[in-house]
Amino acid sequence: IRAILLSHAHYDHCGGARFLQGLAPQARIYLGERDLFFLEESHQSLIYPDRYPFTPFAVDEVYREDTPIVQGRFSIHTFSTPGHTPGCTSFYFEDTDEATGRVYRCAMHGGLGLNTLSDGFLRHTGLPVSLRGEYRRSMERLRALPVDIALGSHPENTSMLERLKQYGDRDYPQCDPALWAEMADS
C-alpha cells in the first residue's frame, strides 16, 4: 500500500485511515483540501467520534485535478465533487483486461448521499447552502465521463451486491456503461 485515497472526511470513509497507515507506514494519505477542516479538533464532532471510533491522522497530500496519482500501471484522476462534503473527491481510471486487451473505464463518485444537503443538516453543521449548487454542477460534469464500470462509495449506490448475485458468473459483473449516467441522474 503506497497511497490511501479518502473520498471525503466522514467517519465511514476516513475513520480507518490511521489504522491503515499503521499497517503501511510508507503510505501517503490523500484528502480533498476543503475537507481538511473536519480534522481540526474544533470540527471533529462532524465526524461523530462520540458514536464511531475515530483516530486522528495527518493528511500528507491534497488532491489536485491536474495531477493524477500514479500507482504502478494506474493513473488515477481525481475530480473535486463538493456536495456530500465540501472536499468530496471522485476518482477515474482505466484498467486493461490482460487476457483480451479491452480497456475498461472505471469511476467512483466520492459521496452520492444527499442527506448532507438537507436544510437541517446544513444548519446543524454550519456548512454553506451553496453546496447544493456545487453538487449539481459537479454531477453534470462527471455525467459526461465515459464509464464502463461505476464503483459506488457504498454498495447500494450501484446495487453492487445484487449485481454480483445476478451476474456473478460473468467476468465483469459490474460492467454496465449506462449505470454511471443513471447514478448521476438519480
Language-model features: locations:
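Loop/turn elements at helix/coil->beta-strand transitions in domains of secreted/extracellular proteins
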Residues: 1, 24-28, 74-75, 103, ...
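Active-site neighborhood of phospho(di)ester-bond hydrolases with catalytic His/Asp-centered motifs
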Residues: 1-10, 29-32, 80-82, 108-110, ...
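Active-site HxH/HxHxD metal-binding segment of metal-dependent hydrolases
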Residues: 1-68, 170, 183
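Short, basic, glycine/proline-bearing loop/turn elements
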Residues: 2, 115-127
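Active-site environment of divalent metal-dependent phosphoester hydrolases
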Residues: 9-15, 36-39, 86-88, 114-118, ...
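Catalytic core of the metallo-beta-lactamase
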Residues: 15, 19-23, 56-117, 137
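Metallo-beta-lactamase
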Residues: 33-80, 85-86, 122-146
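Divalent-metal (often Zn2+) His-rich catalytic cores of metallo-beta-lactamase-fold enzymes
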Residues: 99-101, 114, 128-186
